[in-house]
UniProtKB/Swiss-Prot annotation:
Induction: Induced by albendazole and thiabendazole, which inhibit the GTPase activity of FtsZ and probably septum formation. This is UPF0603 protein Rv2345. Disruption phenotype: Not essential for growth. It is a multi-pass membrane protein. Residues 1-26 form the signal peptide. The lineage of its organism: Bacteria, Bacillati, Actinomycetota, Actinomycetes, Mycobacteriales. May play a role in septum formation. It comes from Mycobacterium tuberculosis (strain ATCC 25618 / H37Rv). Residues 488-567 form a coiled coil. The chain crosses the membrane at residues 162-182, 605-625. It comes from the Bacteria. InterPro entries: TPM_dom. Belongs to the UPF0603 family.
Length: 660
């Protein structure tokens, strides 16, 4: 019986060995002793020779060792696992690649160390998928090994170089096109900016500050050239004008040209400073460019200020005959008015008191004298115009202008007599209304002075002077014999008083609006500060220092606003607005603190959250620090992720494996 049991145990062990043992031909990972190992017997003599030659050539060319091993199967392991274990067992390094092939199991693995120099992942995958695997699939075992060796021994292909060259060429073309487009856009942008800069007042420094720096530089260069050309032209024309009209008549033009030259010289000096080898900061360059433009603009305006007068002077000489004919016609027309105007003056003396006629009593006599003076100058001007002697044109100009002035005065004297009756009647009829208006103005002035807190300062002093002048004018107008003169004086003082009262009324309205704005600003600031203060007071247990700091500053600003309420309302409004802004910020910070605290206590789940937030219970609040007590600190995890840089599922190898 014992013998039977012993025999059964032996049979069981043998059966287990048959069932659990490796299949026939199985080859576990082992240490490789040769570059080409054919344990599956699939290589022919010529095939082994070809593989050996390819392996040797790879080592000779690139010092890379390729190990090739053929087995029937991988003893139940995956191809990658078997190959990796064989690599470790064989102590292969960074210059050792392995091609393992299971002929019966139709599996393979091609592993190349990722640290192997001169080999890319794409290159290895391309060799494995498109050269090794197809050869194995077709049963060409030696061809697969040769393909592996040649693939590792391959330098960058010509197609890759072509692709690289084409890519570089395309990039160069694109960059060139971009440069051309950008240059065109820059030129167009600079032209637009320069056109906009030309529309800016060149003497306005504030307006020039908004002009781009490049446009400012372009504008300065353009203006310097333009103004220099204008100065040169004006200098030449001035020399001819002095010869023609003399130095006295052309003195204003000479002064304008000299001023323009001085301003232009200053512009050139600054422009030289900009163009030297000493670099300037953008701010310094802007300041210098602005000085160039302003100086050039002043030079240009000096010339422009006299251009019109200079042209009129030349036109007067050129058109002297026609102009003298016109003056002669005016002389004749005014001379014919002397008799009728004298008759009209006599009639006025019978209608009005002599005192009312004082301002026009001698008008006819004076007009006759002016006409005689004009006649003499017209005759002298004709003689000079007929002679046309160079250098005597100044006398012609003086004679023409003297005649024009005399005729104008004679016309005004005669017109005054003709309109005297109408003017005197209008003055007499309008005097009561003007007097009433002045009396009303004086009354308003007295009321304003009574209400003013400081009657001897500011515009109130001007108002006192205007009121007193109006009162004196009223006193003189009472019983005046010359109503026209009285009316003229009263209208002037009335206009002055009304203008000053209107200005004071506008200033008072402005002050009233400012005070209303101040009251509104103070009300808003006080309301916000009070609301935030009450909010923090009822939730003091959860609000940190930031909100409290903003509130304290808001209170300080509000106090400053009250201090300046009377002396400087504008500053008081600014302080009140600042207090409102700070209070609003404090409210926002306080809300955030309360919400954070509520979330923390919600996570902890206590029943005293409201009391703690309100500062009634402070034990829990202080138990963990200012912020940590509201839930504690949450530590972060340490260590990298499973896919940290530098790690890979194949243990630092390129390539892979699979079935064929």
């Amino acid at each position: 019986m014992r013998l039977v049991r012993l025999l059964g145990m032996v049979l069981t062990i043998l059966a287990a060995g048959l069932l659990l043992g490796p299949p026939a031909g199985a080859q576990p990972p082992f240490r490789l002793s040769n570059y080409v190992t054919d344990n599956a017997g699939v290589l022919t003599s010529s095939g082994r020779t070809a593989v050996t030659a390819a392996v040797d050539r790879l080592y000779a060319d690139r010092r890379i060792r390729l190990w090739v091993v053929y087995v029937e199967n991988f003893s139940g392991q995956s191809a990658l696992n078997w190959a990796q274990r064989t690599t470790r067992t064989s102590e292969l390094g960074n210059y050792d690649a392995l091609l393992a092939v299971a002929t019966t199991g139709r599996e393979y693995a091609f592993l190349v160390p990722s640290a192997m120099p001169g080999v890319s992942e794409g290159q290895v995958d391309n060799v494995r998928r498109y050269q090794i695997e197809p050869a194995l699939h077709d049963g060409d075992y030696s061809g697969a090994a040769v393909a592996a060796a040649n693939g590792l021994n391959r330098s960058p292909s010509s197609s890759s170089r072509v692709v690289l060259l084409v890519t570089v060429g395309i990039i160069v073309i694109v960059v060139a096109v971009l440069l051309v487009v950008m240059r065109h856009r820059n030129r167009r942008r600079r032209a637009d900016e320069l056109a906009a800069a030309r529309r800016v007042d060149p003497t306005n420094v504030m307006a020039l500050a908004a002009v781009p720096l490049q446009a400012l530089d372009d504008l300065s260069r353009s203006m310097v050239v333009d103004v220099d050309n204008a100065v040169r032209t004006s200098t030449n024309e001035l020399a001819l004008a002095i010869e023609e009209f003399g130095e006295r008549r052309t003195a204003p033009f000479t002064q304008a040209v000299n001023n323009a030259k001085a301003a232009l010289s200053q512009a050139f000096t600054v422009r030289q400073q900009l163009d030297d080898n000493t670099p300037e900061t953008p701010a310094q360059r802007r300041e210098l460019l602005t000085r160039v433009i302003v100086s050039a603009a002043h030079a240009d305006r000096e010339l422009a200020s006299q251009t019109e007068a200079f042209e009129k002077l030349r036109d007067l000489v050129i058109n002297a005959p026609a102009r003298l004919d016109l003056l002669t016609q005016q002389y004749v027309e005014l001379t014919t008015r002397i008799g009728p105007t004298q008759q009209r003056l006599a009639e006025l003396h019978t209608e009005f008191d002599a005192a009312a006629m004082t301002s026009i009593a001698g008008n006819v006599t004076t007009a006759t004298e002016r006409l005689a003076f004009a006649d003499r100058n017209i005759s002298a001007a004709r003689d000079l115009a007929d002679q046309a002697v160079s250098g005597r044109q100044a006398g012609l100009v003086d004679a023409v202008r003297a005649a024009e002035s005399a005729l104008g005065q004679a016309r005004a004297l005669l017109d005054a007599v003709d309109s005297a009756a109408t003017d005197i009647r209008h003055a007499v009829a309008s005097l009561p209304a003007v007097v009433a208006d002045i009396q009303t103005g004086i009354k308003r002035a007295n009321q304003h002075l009574q209400q003013a807190q400081q009657p001897q300062t500011g515009r109130t002093g001007d108002l006192i002077a205007a009121r007193d002048a109006a009162a004196r004018a009223l006193d003189r107008a009472r019983g005046a014999a010359d109503p026209l003169t009285a009316f003229d004086q009263l209208t002037k003082v009335d206009a002055d008083l009304d203008r000053l009262l209107a200005t004071l009324a506008e200033e008072q309205a402005t002050a009233d609006r400012l005070n209303r704005s101040l009251e509104q600003a103070l009300f808003t600031a006080e309301s916000r500060v009070r609301a935030v203060s009450e909010y923090i007071d009822t939730r003091r247990g959860s609000i940190g220092p930031e909100a409290r700091t903003r509130l304290a500053e808001a209170k300080r600003q509000l106090e400053a606003a009250h201090d300046r309420k009377s002396s400087n309302p504008t500053e008081a409004i600014a302080y009140a607005n600042a207090a409102s802004t700070l209070a609003a910020h404090a409210q926002s910070l306080a809300n955030a603190d309360v919400q954070s605290a509520q979330r923390a206590y919600t996570r902890r789940g206590g029943n005293n959250a409201g009391a703690i937030l309100g500062g009634i219970i402070i034990g829990d609040l202080l138990s963990g620090g200012t912020r940590g007590g509201l839930g504690g600190w949450i530590p972060t995890s340490f260590g990298g992720s499973s896919n940290a840089p530098g790690s890979s599922p194949d243990g630092g190898f390129l390539g892979g494996g699979g079935r064929f």
